[in-house]
Amino acid sequence: MIRFTRRTLIAVAAATVAATLSPLALAADTIKIGLVTALSGQSAQAGEALTRGMSIAIDEINAKGGLLGGRKLELVRRDDEGNPAKGVVAARELIFKEKVAVLFGGLDTPVSMAIVPIVNQEKVPFVGPWAAGTGVTRNGANPNFAFRVSAVDELVDKAMLNYAQKTFKSSKAGLILVNNPWGESNEKGITAALAEKGQKPVGVEKFEASDVDLVPQLSRLKAAGADTLYLVGNVGPSAQVVKSLDRMGWKVPVVSHWGPAGGRFTELAGPNAKNVHFVQTFSFFGKLSPVGEKVVAELKAKYPAIKGPDDITPAVGVANAYDGMQLAALAIAKAGSTQGDAIREGFYKIDRYDGLIKSYVKPFSPSVHDALQADDYVWAQFIDNRILPVGLTQ
């Protein structure tokens, strides 16, 4: 008969605990953060930028001991390919299988708009680091689980108009927009901004994301007397606008939403890509704050291909995702748990965060789910395949 001493029983218990803390168990104890974004196709570069911004923030948080008593954060990504249906499948997998505490996503407004009803129903906080459609955060849900650290169409549209009128003395606006919910959102916003000034567009033209010849639409805008084009579209079709203008020989100012920044714009558009001025929320060029210098150093250390600001592109993807992840971590800490309702309330309890883009002071409230405002935007253009603030040629 085997007799167990007290010491033996303690040893057995310790071994049992050790066995329980297998890699799988430890992984389950991490706090999973989901990301649904384009990781392939023309906008893959932007999806990678979001990944890098979030990863740097997560590394910082984990190095400080993690959250909620030492739990580390783990990033789990899924590729939506810019397709709303695939985005929904990816979001459901991350919510129901991976059990993410917070879901980030993504690049395209149609994808985000398809995901928002799911996160509101399942009470999973959703942070948008790119998609600018006004309805992503202003979705009418109560309670609303969608937050954003990015541009907002309604504000961008006013900024585009003000910039065009100040910079190019624009008085006859021609709208050239992608034919999807993002384009519709901006058509309403630009038209409303013009109406506030007693104006209206001289023409509104639409294009499909797959179009390669926009000469017919642009010719109609030229015939209508447009003296400035207001462009809303992602990388590929925005490049086709530039190439179509080249074929027409029409030299007209182009003021754009930030779609051109999302990928291989200069490669696809050619040398006149520099003629497009587009909105951004951040640039790594020029004098950086201490946070900016720290992030650049961390990016260089983690990604050897990054040698300087030229290689951090698109900058807005990195910056928005970095600040968004830090704010989400603060919300989890304020919540004291990974329960969705508590994290949502945690966002409202954030008092201050000195971030990469700016210092955020009470960035969220039940009526304000967008952390960035119009005065946080900057205007940029491509110079020698680099995204630089307009007027900066370093």
Q: What would you call each of these model-derived segments?
A:
Residues 2-12, 27-394:
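Extracytosolic ligand-binding ectodomains
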Residues 20-23:
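N-terminal signal peptide c-region/cleavage motif recognized by signal peptidases
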